[in-house]
């Protein structure tokens, strides 16, 4: 889902009377999505200020499941699709109990990561749930107008005719954390193959310009930028950035299919390493069978060149 967003608000929730409107829209979504199968629902607000509703749904052939719908005022549309949060079939009492536990945990500072959810619950991370909102081109001049600290940011890249995204974590004040291969000293087949099977790499703390142009050449037309988000925001911006700093000391090997920049940014945001691009069978196959020529390698590695030249390029563009 690709949409265009406006300058960011200071909160993912509503303000004043807007809170009432958000709750009304959430309950309208419950009626539209579940109809008569909705047996019980409870509205709530997370410790991070995000409105949500938890729903007990009656299954067609018996039993119940628990689902969630959230609101994020920074997204368009800002009401999420419903997603299941129970780990299996339940009785109605079990569903109500899970809703009570989740309501309590979601209201606590710190909340939880998706890799360690409360007992009986699950929070899937998949392409069908991740929303990409296109950020106005003005973000290249004024990052803090359109982004918030801890945002997961995708930069559109074209590799040998295949569209990929280079991702990172916006750290505020025009700086980003992102995961890239170390510069290759040669263009040998062995060095090229390493990018696909495990190459030396590290998390770097870069200016916005260096992040955006880490894998593409500088041109008069800047690449498209997207903000990626899961329906449930489980970490504050500060927590996301701190986790990026933690991974800066931990990550050392890059594998385009199993440990790439998107795995890094997803783990920072949700606790679960996930690659938006590698869910595509076509892209996964392309990265598996595509001959790793120097063209591909140069697109996947951090260029071994004088980065100071970027400053003059940025000023002149």
From Swiss-Prot:
InterPro entries documented for this protein: LRAT_dom, Vulval_toroid_morpho-assoc
PROSITE patterns, per the entry: LRAT
TM annotation in the entry: none
LRAT domain span: 156-277
Protein EC: 2.3.1.-
GO biological process entries: cell morphogenesis; egg-laying behavior; embryo development ending in birth or egg hatching; nematode larval development; positive regulation of vulval development; vulval development
GO cellular component term of the entry, any: cytoplasmic side of apical plasma membrane
Tissues with expression: Highly expressed in the cells of the spermatheca, the mouth, and the lining of the pharynx, the rectum, and the excretory canal. Also expressed in the pharyngeal intestinal junction cell.
Membrane topology category: Peripheral membrane protein
Active-site residues (renumbered): 166, 178, 261 (acyl-thioester intermediate)
Localization of this protein: Apical cell membrane
Pfam family, one: LRAT
An example Gene Ontology molecular-function term: acyltransferase activity
Keywords: Acyltransferase, Cell membrane, Membrane, Transferase
Disulfide-bonded cysteines: none
Primary role: Putative acyltransferase. Plays a role in the morphogenesis of a vulval toroid cell, vulF, which is located where the vulva and the uterus connect. Not required for specifying vulval cell fate.
The protein's name in its UniProt record: Egg-laying defective protein 26
Recorded name of the encoding gene: egl-26
